[in-house]
UniProtKB/Swiss-Prot annotation:
Disruption phenotype: No visible phenotype; its associated toxin gene (parE2, not annotated in UniProtKB) is non-functional. This is Orphan antitoxin ParD2. GO terms for biological process: regulation of DNA-templated transcription; SOS response. Pfam families: RHH_1. It comes from the Bacteria. The lineage of its organism: Bacteria, Pseudomonadati, Pseudomonadota, Alphaproteobacteria, Caulobacterales. InterPro entries: CopG, Non-func_TypeII_TA_Antitoxin. Keywords: Toxin-antitoxin system. Antitoxin component of a non-functional type II toxin-antitoxin (TA system). Does not neutralize the effect of any of the RelE or ParE toxins. The gene is parD2.
Length: 95
């Protein structure tokens, strides 16, 4: 048995960078012994992954609110304000 992997053809993108950003990018790439394109691709991939994570977290928060899985804002504020005081309060419960 053998496996055949088909790699997607890379897409190309043209961007214009201001001179300061281009200089910093060149310095970073040189310091990492990587081409600038690899640094840019990693940065874009990280941005997209972070955005995906943020969108999923927002969606989960909205679902939690719709289902009533939330804490009273004032009670949470009072709890946080009590931190580090002699009368620290326990974590509030969901009502």
């Amino acid at each position: 048995m053998f496996w055949i992997f088909v790699m997607a053809k890379p897409a190309s993108l043209s961007i214009e960078l201001d001179s300061d950003l281009d200089r910093r990018l060149s310095e970073i790439a040189e310091g990492m012994d990587q081409p600038k394109t690899a640094i840019i691709e990693r940065a874009l991939r990280d941005f997209v992954e972070l955005r995906d994570w943020q969108d999923a977290a927002i969606d989960e928060g909205l679902r939690a609110a719709e289902e009533g899985r939330v804490f009273d804002h004032d009670k949470v504020g009072e709890w946080i304000d009590s931190w580090g005081t002699p009368n620290e309060r326990p974590m509030p419960s969901r009502d």
